[in-house]
Regions:
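Conserved small/polar residues in nucleotide/adenosyl-binding loops
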Residues: 294-300
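Carbohydrate-associated surface elements
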Residues: 99
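Gly/Ser/Thr-rich active-site cleft segment
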Residues: 2, 8-10, 21, 118-238
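Short beta-strand segments
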Residues: 73-76, 153-156, 234, 254-260, ...
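N-terminal glycine/serine-rich phosphate-binding loop of ATP-dependent small-molecule kinases
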Residues: 1-92, 120, 148, 220-221, ...
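Catalytic phosphate/nucleotide-handling subdomain of diverse soluble enzymes
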Residues: 239-293
Length: 300
């Protein structure tokens, strides 16, 4: 039996084939571009992500029996805003985690709504990279596009949608949207009201390991895989990396250095940093939370 891991990074997708013992059988990477249409902006076309996956998976399986693939799990860059219309077509390029255009919206959330309220609603305060400020930016600057939004997704969730046809996300990734009530693991009605969106526009929530569906007939044919391959909800990249490093349960520290740098400590119980210096996110191990501090490079 084989399992496929998808890591949707900022500059490339990394694909891994693993057998049932946990041994790595093959690794493939495919790059895609980042657009910087204005100073401080950072965007990608979700179609480029999917094209890279479709090109990479057949190469990953070259020399292996594709009929033995039983499951797929995706992780990836967090916070990016993917918006779909009523036909599930992408409305505009994804605004990435390292995009800096939303400072005015961040100032509104932290200053007018207030950090204390945000912390109560979501266990976090606003940062430019988070998803909610991007929604407010769209509402303020692209009202026609904002009015067309049928579904709001994160980057790896778009890949899961293309694989399964299901609009879904997991708690670890959703924690970085500033739309999730992290403590109670549900969408925050207060934040939805602030951002002017409905819960029906948001994806269904899952634990990272839970199956969300199997491959659509189209995805199975495109990728050369059986249609009964199970796809799990997956996780945000840092939560997924933490599990891979053994940072599960309480009192473990994980440091990740990539396009961004992250440091977080796992916890068995929910908590909020009263100084607002750390983020409180759901973890991919299910029900546990960790505090996250990251540094982001500035886009061009």
């Amino acid at each position: 039996m084989y399992y496929i891991g998808i890591d949707l990074g900022t500059s490339a997708v990394k694909l891994l084939l693993m057998d049932e013992t946990g041994s790595i059988a093959n690794i493939v990477s495919r790059e895609y571009p980042i657009a910087f249409p204005h100073p401080g902006w950072s965007e990608q076309d979700p179609a480029d992500w999917w094209a890279a996956v479709c090109d990479g998976i057949p190469a990953l399986l070259d020399g292996f029996d594709a009929s033995q693939v039983k499951g797929i799990g995706a992780g990836g860059q967090m916070h990016g805003l993917v918006v779909l219309d009523k036909n599930d077509a992408v409305i505009r390029p994804c605004i990435l985690w390292n995009d800096g255009r939303t400072q005015r919206q961040v100032d509104y959330l932290n200053g007018v709504i207030g950090k204390d309220k945000l912390s109560r609603y979501t266990a976090n305060i606003a940062f430019a990279g988070f998803t909610a400020p991007k929604l407010l930016w769209m509402r303020d600057n692209e009202p026609d596009n904002f009015a067309r939004i049928e579904k709001i997704m994160l980057p790896k969730d778009y890949i899961n949608y293309k694989l399964t046809g299901v609009h879904c996300t997991d708690y670890s990734d959703a924690s970085g949207m500033l739309l999730l009530d992290v403590e109670h693991k549900c969408w925050s009605n207060e934040m939805l009201d602030i951002c002017g969106v409905q819960e029906s526009q948001l994806p269904k929530l899952f634990e990272s390991w839970q199956p969300v569906g199997t491959l659509t007939a189209e995805a199975a044919q495109t990728l050369g895989l059986p249609a009964d391959v199970v796809v799990c909800a997956g996780a945000g990249d840092n939560a997924a990396a933490a599990v891979g490093c053994g940072a599960v349960g309480g009192g473990k520290c994980n440091i990740s250095l990539g396009t961004s740098g992250t440091v977080f400590i796992t916890s068995n119980t929910f908590g909020v940093d009263k100084q607002n210096a750390l983020h409180s996110f759901a973890h991919a191990d299910g029900g546990y939370h960790f505090c996250l501090l990251y540094t982001s490079p500035s886009p061009r």
